[in-house]
Design a protein with these regions (language model features):
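Conserved P-loop/Walker A NTP-binding site and adjacent catalytic elements of P-loop NTPases
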Residues: 24-130, 150-200
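Helicase-associated low-complexity/disordered flanking segments
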Residues: 1-43, 133-136
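Long, intrinsically disordered low-complexity tandem-repeat segments
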Residues: 130-143
Length: 200
């Protein structure tokens, strides 16, 4: 079911404690997004540049990391990944961030991994291939990866650790040449992983 949230956000919501984590009043769309994240729903945020659409993603990072889970933040280009990595490190020094852009690979066991969408797509392809090759041992098929994990771009237990993937600039899915990479990535994500999609 798709719920379109265009009206004013109701007062005295049970989610007020989450909104109060920020030292400024939130926009209605930010409140709706936070509600959907807390409720375990996928979320698409469409807003103008500079309107604060990254705030729901930042909330998700804090929300899931506080639960001991991990978050992947994807962007369409290396420069944006680098910028987000720098910005988030400065803003949240208590959270560990890793960066994977093809040229740079740092902190593979971080709480939040920032990367291009293509890198996540390739990682999910490897993950699905591994699972298909080990269906006979379905209870331990991923958790007991040993030497094979060193070949991966980053090390994360997708089934047990990954809670959320943020797709920044998700409108790239309409790109004639690269859009299929977003489609494939979304289709390969396990059902338990929440998606937060940000678009101008």
């Amino acid at each position: 079911m798709v719920k379109v949230c265009e009206s004013n956000y109701p007062n005295n919501s049970k989610y007020e404690s989450h909104f109060e984590l920020f030292p400024f009043p939130l926009s209605d769309f930010q409140k709706y997004a936070i509600e959907s994240i807390v409720e375990g729903q996928h979320c698409l945020v469409t807003a103008h540049t500079g309107s604060g659409k990254t705030l729901p993603a930042e909330f998700a990072i804090r929300h899931f990391v506080s639960q001991g889970k991990k978050v992947i933040y994807t962007s369409p280009i290396k420069a944006l990944s680098n910028q987000k990595y720098y910005d988030f490190q400065q803003k949240y020094p208590d959270i560990q961030f890793g960066l994977f852009t093809g040229d740079i690979k740092t902190n593979p066991e971080a709480d939040v991994l920032i990367m291009t969408t293509e890198i996540l797509m390739n990682r999910l392809f490897q993950y699905n291939q591994y699972n298909q090759c080990n269906q006979y041992n379905q209870y331990n098929q991923y958790n007991q990866m040993d030497s094979s994990t060193s070949e991966m771009d980053f090390q994360i237990n997708i089934e047990k650790e990954l809670a959320c993937v943020v797709f920044d600039e998700v409108h790239y899915i309409n790109d004639a040449h690269r859009g299929q990479n977003w489609e494939k990535t979304i289709l390969m994500l396990p059902h338990h992983v929440q998606m937060i999609m940000l678009s101008a």
